[in-house]
Design a protein with these regions (language model features):
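Conserved donor-binding/catalytic core segment of Leloir-type glycosyltransferases
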Residues: 1-21, 27-31
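A conserved nucleotide-sugar
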Residues: 23-50, 132
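Short alpha-helical segment that forms part of, or immediately flanks, the ligand-binding pocket
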Residues: 52, 75-79, 90-94
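Short alpha-helical donor nucleotide-sugar binding micro-motif in glycosyltransferases
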Residues: 52-58
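Aromatic "clamp/platform" in nucleotide-sugar-dependent glycosyltransferases that forms part
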Residues: 65-66
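Short hydrophobic beta-strand element within catalytic cores of glycosyltransferases
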Residues: 83-86
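Short acidic/histidine- and often glycine-rich active-site loop of Leloir-type glycosyltransferases
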Residues: 88-104
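A charged, aromatic-enriched C-terminal amphipathic alpha-helix characteristic of glycosyltransferases
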Residues: 107-160
Length: 161
């Protein structure tokens, strides 16, 4: 069971390596917060079990995505009590609670990120240091995502009616 694993001061980038995912922002943040462990999942040859162990141990699943339709990895993180740190844009806008969103303009591109870097760093520190207090909110977020976006109940009801 990946939920309830001992958490590390770890931030995960679970996305594919593509320009619109803005890995450069994640890498720059790692240089400014070296006291935390930073994992880019796609640079490793992970089994599913290894991937879920990393999620289970992480405190944050980070996104600065400029393109996203559903964002399964952030949901997976929430299921194992990791903070889904997402921009207030794209599908994240309607899917995630305000507690886990940061202003879209902070990461619209690398230049915008450099202007808002300290604010992002402060938010990461808050999520890491106060993670235990955030767990009830993460549970609420995961339940909301499951009920509204990651269920086929309504689809099956429509098909079978």
């Amino acid at each position: 069971n990946y939920k309830g694993m001992k958490k590390k001061d770890m931030i995960v980038f679970p996305h594919r390596l593509a320009p619109e995912k803005q890995l450069d922002i994640f890498e720059d943040l790692s240089n400014h917060l070296p006291q935390y462990e930073w994992i880019v999942c796609q640079t490793k040859q992970l089994t599913k079990n290894e991937y879920y162990n990393i999620l289970g141990e992480s405190k944050i699943v980070f996104s600065a995505n400029l393109q996203e339709t559903l964002g399964i990895s952030c949901y997976e993180g929430a299921l194992v009590d990791s903070v889904p740190m997402v921009p207030d844009r794209l599908s994240y806008k309607e899917m995630y609670m305000d507690e886990f969103k940061y202003p879209s303009e902070w990461t619209t591109d690398f230049n915008a990120y450099t202007k808002h870097k300290q604010e992002i760093i402060n938010k990461i520190r808050y999520y890491i240091e106060d993670h235990t207090k955030l767990v009830p909110h993460i549970h609420k977020q995961a339940k909301s995502l499951q009920k509204k976006f990651f269920t086929a109940t309504n689809l099956y009801a429509t098909i079978n009616s």
